[in-house]
Amino acid sequence: MQSRRFHRLSRFRKNKRLLRERLRQRIFFRDRVVPEMMENPRVLVLTGAGISAESGIRTFRAADGLWEEHRVEDVATPEGFARNPGLVQTFYNARRQQLQQPEIQPNAAHLALAKLEEALGDRFLLVTQNIDNLHERAGNRNIIHMHGELLKVRCSQSGQILEWNGDVMPEDKCHCCQFPAPLRPHVVWFGEMPLGMDEIYMALSMADIFIAIGTSGHVYPAAGFVHEAKLHGAHTVELNLEPSQVGSEFEEKHYGPASQVVPEFVDKFLKGL
């Protein structure tokens, strides 16, 4: 797994240019600022719940802090799983069922990012906070799911990851170990370290352009990615329904529904290559 990750990152690193030099070279187009035409730009995209909301995926987190009438502590923490695994499995079973409903499909924003990856190839990396598979279904392949994946489970003892499309019952066990261990959702809960962070920070240090889509800017470490990218000279872009908590950090900003602003941005970007 580790070698595959660094192989993917080495491809993203190809043709590294002088990052600081391009900061002094800007072209102004109306309300947008884009870097001077770069040869083989490396693009890192971060997506959050806002990109999937238009596909019918509920964000679950309500204004009162409840997730589907449950306290976060009960359904999205290791302690909650230890106290009541049945409740936690039922919660994620419902989310898994919803994701696989026929009406849940990638929207125009997902499809635009797949188009962008097709054009850029190995110079594109997508980091998502979402645990759905809509990016994959749209056609993206170079993806890091930093918060895990809903259609996977893992052994609570060995960490082995398994594909899983159906419900998970408390009595379901993983038999990869000498002693069968409970299965848990392959998702990152509060208090746990997000996945792929070493690879993500290395990619942030090499990106020419950093784009955040549908993120609130409330959740760290992802909220700090824009600052990290800027430190290394990347041009930063926010595509969101409204300004995020860290919106002031971005050099370029476009606001509106993801299904509208993302395809528009991608089309203009690709025309400038």
Curated annotation (Swiss-Prot):
GO molecular function, one term: NAD+ binding
Cofactor note text: Binds 1 zinc ion per subunit.
Residues reported to bind substrate: 92, 95
Result of knocking out the encoding gene: Single mutant grows on cobinamide (CBI), CBI plus 5,6-dimethylbenzimidazole (DMB) and cobalamin (CBL); double cobB-cobT deletion mutants do not grow on CBI plus DMB. Single mutant does not grow on propionate. Acetyl-CoA synthetase (acs) accumulates in an inactive, acetylated form. Considerably decreased growth on 1,2-propanediol, cells do not excrete more propanediol than wild-type.
Gene3D superfamilies noted in UniProt: SIR2/SIRT2 'Small Domain, TPP-binding domain
Comment field on protein domains: 2 residues (Tyr-92 and Arg-95) present in a large hydrophobic pocket are probably involved in substrate specificity. They are important for desuccinylation activity, but dispensable for deacetylation activity.
Protein name: NAD-dependent protein deacylase
The organism of origin for this protein: Salmonella typhimurium (strain LT2 / SGSC1412 / ATCC 700720)
